[in-house]
Amino acid sequence: GIVNSILKTTDYPNFEIVVVRDVNANGQMVHPFTLPNDTRILLADFDQSFHLAKKWNHGVLASKGDVVVVLDDDTHVDKPEWLSQIVGQLQFSDIGVVGPMLLLEDGRISSAGITMKPRPTHLSHGKSSLSDGWMGVHSVARSVSAISGACMAFRRSDFNTVGGFSENYRVSYADIDFCMKLAAQGLRTAWTPRSRVYHFGARTLGATEDASDYAMLNSRWGRFIGSDAYARNNA
């Protein structure tokens, strides 16, 4: 699982892992699993029905670090520098949130950031991660409109400033909304190919969306949907 891969792989000197686990009203795990015996692991029980934004907020509030990384449980890391490379981007004060190159199980790109044109879509989905891409877009860190909540790093202070992840979204788009809220504070969303994270549950953006979620995203940030200052059509 992701916890084992983090502990075995990561070269970052000081980190904790907060595992948000689903429990029932009696405090019993809904989906039992075992974790390594490691003092860096903290459990945060979540006893509500599934709600991604609420779980993200719950995990962030249970953590203690100045920088927080949200990771889906269907991700996997195999490069020591995956964490240091995304956290390192936050040394730039105008960057609010950072994401890695997300990979499909076969090594192709799952997401190289998210474009808002013509509607929220994963950039370079299905393309080779071994290629530099059009104009080198796969080889350099750059600004994007948004990134996936499957893996994103941000400062706790900025999380608090924008009120965390909006819990008004039922299924999708709370991650994009978070990036938009940071942008409204003058903070950029960055993506770096120097950090690569597998996302086994990767799907086409919007494949499981709730229509009301998209309507809410459109009502809040519709002025940005349909245009993108950072993406090109063949990126």
Where do the protein language model's features map onto the residues?
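A short, conserved alpha-helix in the catalytic core of glycosyltransferases
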Residues: 82-86, 138-163, 168-198
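A conserved acidic beta->alpha catalytic loop
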Residues: 21-32, 76
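Glycine-rich, basic loop-to-helix element that forms the pyrophosphate-binding segment
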Residues: 46-63
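Short beta-strand/loop segment that forms part of the nucleotide-sugar
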Residues: 14-24, 42-46
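C-terminal, non-catalytic tails of nucleotide-sugar-dependent glycosyltransferases
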Residues: 96, 106-107, 118-143, 148, ...
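Short aromatic/hydrophobic "clamp" motif used to bind/position activated sugar donors
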Residues: 68
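Short, acidic, metal-binding catalytic loop of nucleotide-sugar glycosyltransferases
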Residues: 4-14
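Conserved donor NDP-sugar-binding/catalytic core segment of glycosyltransferases
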Residues: 75, 79-118
